[in-house]
């Protein structure tokens, strides 16, 4: 698997925004990233408790090309470029990882998504909770996914 930032790819690469025939947007990556002591990166199957990751990965089997858009946690001072990773066959798709800070992940995912939307979408309106102070971060993160 090759890791690059979007600036490293030629304009005709399939992972350039708006050019993939099939795009899947999901908050988690299709594989967990493991980095050895020598800096070598490996991708391993996720231990998804509900099986959604393997199911979503299977969607790419019938596609000639595609891009999976997910986030990656970044340090506050770290590089903020999107990362593009060409996954090896049989997972022949691009992984586009959007950099999100710990604060963005907490606000977007743990607060707004899990406490506000999930209870309603899963028919538990009594568990609905909202904190409008997180809404601007939710919009910011969604805009990043939309641009990808």
Identify what each model region corresponds to.
Residues 1-106, 110:
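N-terminal low-complexity, Ser/Thr- and acidic-residue-enriched intrinsically disordered segments
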Residues 102-148:
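Conserved nucleotide-sugar donor-binding subdomain of glycosyltransferases
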